[in-house]
């Protein structure tokens, strides 16, 4: 039999040796496995050649393959998160058509929920009409101050959705903080930031833990919702007076100095009227004040300190809504086509789309 001092540490067996068969090699005198030679030898789980590859670690142990989709997805938001008026019916929620957790296979929204289900249905617990009451916690009219309560609602509801905890939460809040009666009555930025922290703290401290995937969408360029319907008599006369966003919609007729100016909300042109200038100031506050809070608080205060490392801020401010993207009822909320646009842009700008051919330039 082989001398015991010649046996490698992982105990090969040969001759008359006896040992746990689960730890024994087949050949007496076989060499110690060589990690990185491309041959799966005794004691190795895998060996695809290069050390530290995508399949094997430096010890030739298999690297667990993470699912390319989350285990489930919850939604926090406002009227956009409820799909309000997506079908053109004023005030009616359309949860099935929401950009994040929508579930209607017959529409063209192709929500994040549907993309995850189509990508790996075995790993992902999809939203549907029976689960939506637990998954979609968005409430029409919600402001950032409601983030705390909606986050707690997710924590309380997640036990009802496999695997019993929230693996991903999509968040779009802030639209109703910037939409107000005037520029002066928009939510105070300091309060906005503190309310944002309150919601993040709930998600970070809850049983979701630090590994929860958060997709935090920036406030879209709401200016383009006005622009898309500004020449529509019905919208200007009958719909917009009842929409709670008068710092954008009041004086709905275009008084910009030129069509070039109206199509360039980032700059004030000589001769721009007071309504035009107010709308451009509204646009700038979203760009320069509120969205930077959403980005910087997450990255500089939480992630820089090792918290919520699987969260990501998605900036969709450059998305331009056209007439087809705005419903014809209240002339303000995204239509199903608008929800589809938001779904595509949010998904393709997120880390979940890394291998998606549909997001290729």
Describe the function of each predicted region.
Residues 1-65:
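Cysteine-rich modules of extracellular adhesion/ECM and protease-associated proteins
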Residues 83-89, 147-148, 180-185, 226-230, ...:
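Short, solvent-exposed loop/turn and secondary-structure capping segments
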């Amino acid at each position: 039999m082989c001398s015991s001092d010649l046996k490698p540490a992982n105990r090969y067996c040969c001759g008359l040796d006896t040992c746990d068969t689960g730890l024994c090699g087949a050949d007496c005198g076989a060499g110690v496995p060589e990690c990185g030679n491309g041959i799966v030898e005794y004691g190795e789980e895998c060996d695809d050649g290069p050390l530290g590859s995508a399949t094997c670690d430096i010890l030739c142990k298999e690297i667990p393959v993470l699912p390319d989709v989350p285990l489930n997805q919850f939604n926090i938001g406002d009227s956009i998160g409820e799909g309000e008026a997506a079908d053109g019916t004023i005030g009616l929620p359309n949860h099935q058509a929401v950009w994040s957790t929508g579930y209607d296979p017959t529409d063209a929204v192709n929500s994040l929920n549907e993309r995850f289900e189509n990508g790996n249905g075995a790993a992902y617990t999809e939203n549907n009409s029976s689960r939506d009451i637990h998954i979609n916690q968005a409430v029409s009219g919600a402001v950032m101050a409601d983030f705390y309560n909606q986050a707690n609602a997710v924590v309380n509801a997640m036990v009802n959705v496999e695997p019993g905890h929230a693996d991903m939460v999509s968040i779009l809040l802030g639209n109703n903080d910037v939409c107000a009666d005037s520029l002066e009555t928009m939510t105070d930025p300091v309060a906005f930031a503190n309310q944002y922290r309150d919601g993040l703290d709930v998600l970070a401290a809850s049983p979701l833990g630090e590994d929860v995937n958060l997709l935090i969408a920036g406030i879209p360029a709401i200016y383009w919702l006005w622009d898309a319907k500004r020449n529509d008599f019905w919208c200007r006369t009958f719909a917009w007076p009842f929409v709670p966003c008068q710092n954008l919609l009041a004086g709905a007729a275009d008084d910009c100095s030129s069509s070039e100016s109206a199509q360039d909300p980032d700059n004030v042109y000589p001769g721009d009227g007071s309504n035009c200038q107010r709308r451009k100031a509204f646009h700038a506050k979203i760009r320069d004040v509120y969205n930077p809070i959403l980005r910087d608080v997450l990255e500089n205060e939480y992630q820089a300190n090792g918290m919520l490392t699987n969260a990501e801020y998605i900036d969709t401010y450059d998305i331009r809504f056209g007439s087809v993207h705005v419903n014809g009822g209240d002339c303000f909320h995204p239509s199903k086509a608008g929800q589809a646009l938001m779904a595509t842009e949010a998904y393709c700008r997120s880390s979940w789309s890394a291998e998606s051919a549909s997001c290729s330039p």
